[in-house]
Structures are given as C-alpha cells and as structure tokens.
From Swiss-Prot:
The protein's role, per its UniProt record: Involved both in the piRNA and miRNA metabolic processes. As a component of the meiotic nuage, plays a central role during oogenesis by repressing transposable elements and preventing their mobilization, which is essential for the germline integrity. Repression of transposable elements is mediated via the piRNA metabolic process, which mediates the repression of transposable elements during meiosis by forming complexes composed of piRNAs and Piwi proteins and governs the repression of transposons.
Stated family: Belongs to the maelstrom family.
Chain's gene name: mael
Annotated keywords: Cytoplasm, Developmental protein, Differentiation, DNA-binding, Meiosis, Nucleus, Oogenesis, Repressor, RNA-mediated gene silencing, Transcription, Transcription regulation
GO cellular component entries: cytoplasm; nucleus; P granule; perinuclear region of cytoplasm
Full protein name: Protein maelstrom
GO terms for biological process, alphabetical: germ-line stem cell population maintenance; male meiotic nuclear division; negative regulation of DNA-templated transcription; oogenesis; piRNA processing; regulation of miRNA-mediated gene silencing; regulatory ncRNA-mediated gene silencing; spermatogenesis
Region (Disordered) residue spans: 373-394, 419-443
Subcellular location: Cytoplasm; Nucleus
Pfam families: Maelstrom (PF13017)
Length: 465
C-alpha cells in the first residue's frame, strides 16, 4: 500500500495553529473548520509555498531510513568498514608478495631487505584506538647478512590519558615495567622522534620506495596508532610520507615458499598454519644479551621491543638460511652466545671423551652426522656397559614352569587336565617347583596330614557328657 500524500491545506492548518494563539486553543477539527474559509479566499500564489511543503514532506517520507543492527550501528556503515578492512588486507598481501617476487626475479632474494618494528605502550583509550607509546624498536634484516642495524628508543609522552593511571600501571607492571609519566624515560620530543624514525626507515629502504615495516598481526592496530600519535606532533609532515604496517607472519609464509622454490625443495607441506605456528613458538624468547640495558637489569627481556625485533630476525634465519645454504653468523643470524645441548656419539667408544661436538638448537643442514655403517650393537655398547663385563648374574623368576611342548601341560580355559596324565606328572611338577618362591598356591607342594594331627580341645569331654 502506497503511503498517503501530504495535503497542502493540512500544511497550512498546522502552520496557522503554530503561529496563532487562537489556533493553539482550538482542537484539530475546529482549526480545520476555521481555516477552510481562509483557504478558499487564498490565491494560487499564496497557496504555492504550502503545496511545495507538502511535496517536500512526501519526498522525505519516501526516503528509506538506514537499517540498524542489534548494536544500534548502521548496517551500511558497518559494511563499509568491513569492505575497507578487506581491501586493506588484500593490499597488504599483494604488496608483500610483490616485494618478495621482485627480489626473486632479480635473483637477489637473499639480499632483500626488510624492516621489523614494534612498540610498547602505556595505555589505550577506552572508546577509541588511541595508544600512548612507551618504547620503539626497529631492525633492518636480510637473509644473507642477518641483522644489519637496530634502532631503539624509549618514549616519554609527558602524560597519559586522564583517568587511566591505574590501567597504565597494571599494564606496565605485567609487561615491560617502564616507569609511567612524569617519571618516564626516553625521548620527550615526539616530533623529533618521528623524524628520526622516518630518517632511519628512509636510509634502510631508500628515498624513492614506500616506507614499510613488518610486525605481528595482533600488533598492527597498535603500531599504526603509535605512529599516528607521533606524527600528529610533527608539523612538517615530512613531505606527506606515511609508514605502512604489514603482517610479518604473512611475510614469513611467502618468503619461505619462494626460498624453497629457489632451492628446488618440495614445499607441499608448507602453508600459512605451519609458518604461523613456527613463528609463535618464539624459540629465542629467553636469549640473554639482546634486550636493552634497562630490561636486562629488570629481568623483562621478553617484553623489550629491541629483544622482540631481534628474536624475529633470528626466527627468520633459523627457518630459511639452511634452505639457501647460508652460513649463519653469531650475533647476526643466531645469538652471539649459545650453549651446547647435545653431543655426537662416535662408533668408537674410546673416543667419547674426545669427540663431543658443539650443538645448538638451530636447523642447520649437516649439523647432525649419522653413519650408516654404524650397527646397533656398537651404539649400545658405547652408551652402556655390556652384560658380559658386569658381575650381575641374571635369575629366572618365571612363575609358570610347565613344559609347554606337552599338550597336557598347556593351559586352557575352563578345562582340567585329563586324569590319566595328572598322576604321572604331579611328582615331576612338584620337583620343578621346589625352589620357586613366587608360584601360585595351587602349584606349591602340599604336605599330607592325617586326622590325628587335628584335635579340638574339649571335644572329648563333650562326647563323654
């Protein structure tokens, strides 16, 4: 059913009641009756504004109202946000793939440079995505050279969001343990810090290339917000250059696939879930000497941004340098100091004390040498003393001592031995069981007693009575 159209006359009645004291005292039927005589005397020119107002009201009614979801948000607005997020994700993936594939086409994949970056923050606004930064670190990395350079700085924002001091204190005490403003450490000039970061990224990636940093997916929103926090204090805007933040886990997946393709290795078992699981294991989490001095002194190296970007670089090297036969360098691809945690056992038992090998946990090709001609007996003799050389004499404690080669002795379910074999074998069985201590009761020798061996005191008296 089509909606009713507005009447120009009713528009006139409504306006007359609103502008006249007498009209406000009347009911609607009375006002319609009174305005009818006035409407008849009006010219077409006088009625024109009311007719236009009626048409405008019709148009407004025909306009659809925006539908809302259960949270009171406009559905069209929510769809637009989701569409922009999907486009941003697709742009990130395509840009990452383009970086890796271009390096592969130029036969320079091992020298491709990537920048890993992350922030620590004091607190986050309750209703917006504003983060107050506390610490920043970035690392320039390539497969061949490992860690090329590291930029790290603590940040003193001067103040935190009003009313969130308790949240900031709780977050700091449970993570990075940095002192809160006004006692915060580090750079106080946000504009200067942002320009220093821009200069470092430009030096790493070149002035004509977009500034791209990689960080874990769960930190992307936080890192973008912290960059905006620093950028808003910079009036120069540095020529309008912005920093793009991409997913480091997707970079690991794409880079691993291309590295295995270059090395002519089978990559059927490599997928996004495998690479994500490898990255999240964080094998180098407790490596000493890679965090800043403050976090080293306070035993919070796990949450230090400098330690984070360094561990990510070590993870990339551990996962892919072996595929390209790249020799790892301590301090660049792996920690500078490692602890031996295994040894290679030689086939010669006498050389055990002389041939212990340095070991690390890293997946380097040829790190474990296995000799095919090494027999199992030699390995057993080299790892434990032999039986012949020991003074221990084994003793048979077998509970079942019957001869299973005889049909009559073979145990059966719900069946007794035949009577013709029982009498012949009982004496032989008892002789075999004479020295056994752990036999069941029915297998032990039974001493025969006569009736005279059993007597009950007072029994004779009772019979006499």
């Amino acid at each position: 059913m089509a909606p009713k159209k507005h009447s120009a006359f009713m528009v006139f009645v409504t306006e007359w009641r609103n502008h006249n004291v007498e009209g406000r005292r009347m009911t609607l039927p009375q006002a319609v009756s009174h305005c009818g005589t006035i409407w008849e005397k009006m010219t077409a020119q006088q009625r024109g504004p009311y007719q236009s107002g009626a048409k405008d009201a019709d148009v407004a009614d025909r306009a659809k109202r925006e539908r809302l979801n259960c949270h009171g948000q406009g559905i069209a607005q929510v769809d637009q946000v989701q569409k922009e997020a999907a486009e941003s994700l697709m742009h990130m993936k395509r840009s990452t793939e383009r970086l890796v594939i271009n390096a592969k086409k130029s036969h320079d994949l091992e020298n491709a440079k990537f920048v890993f970056a992350t922030f620590n923050y004091f607190t986050k606004a309750l209703t917006t995505d504003v983060y107050v930064p506390a610490e920043f670190a970035a690392c320039e990395y390539s497969l061949k050279e490992g860690i090329r350079s590291i930029y790290s700085s603590m940040i003193d924002p001067g103040q935190i969001i009003f009313g969130q001091g308790s949240d900031a204190l709780h977050h700091s005490s449970t993570t990075h343990d940095l002192p809160l403003p006004p006692n915060a450490l580090g750079e106080k000039n946000m504009a200067k810090l942002y320009r220093n970061i821009i200069d470092y990224l430009t030096k790493c990636q070149g002035g004509d290339k977009p500034l791209i940093v990689f960080t874990p997916a769960e930190n992307i929103a936080m890192v973008k917000s912290c960059f905006r926090y620093l950028e808003c204090e910079d009036d120069s805007k540095d020529g309008g250059r912005t920093i793009q933040v991409f997913d480091i886990e997707y970079l690991l997946f794409i880079l691993k696939k291309e590295v295995m393709d270059v090395a002519d290795l089978n990559d059927e078992k490599i997928n996004k879930f495998v690479t994500d699981a490898f990255f999240k294991k964080d094998f180098f989490e407790f490596t000493a000497g890679i965090a800043c001095q403050y976090h080293e002194d306070n035993d919070r190296t796990k949450y230090c941004t400098q330690s984070m970007v360094t561990r990510w670089a070590y993870t990339f090297s551990d996962f892919m340098c072996g595929d390209l036969a790249i020799t790892v360098q301590p301090g660049k691809h792996i920690p500078a100091h490692t602890k031996p945690n295994y040894r290679i056992i030689s086939s010669d038992a006498s050389s055990l004390a002389h041939e212990s090998s340095f070991d690390s946990f890293y997946s380097l090709p040829g790190s474990r040498v296995k000799k095919e001609n090494q027999s199992e007996d030699v390995l057993l003799s080299s790892s434990r003393p032999s039986v012949e050389s020991s003074s221990y004499t084994p003793t048979d404690h077998t509970a079942f001592t019957a001869d299973l080669s005889k049909l009559c002795e073979f145990p059966s379910l719900g069946m007794r031995n035949s009577s013709k074999h029982r009498g012949l074998d009982v004496s032989a069985q008892r002789e075999r069981n004479a020295g056994a201590w752990n036999l069941p009761t029915h297998s032990r020798s039974i001493q025969k007693f006569s009736d005279n061996d059993f007597s009950v005191t007072g029994a004779d008296g009772k019979h006499k009575n």
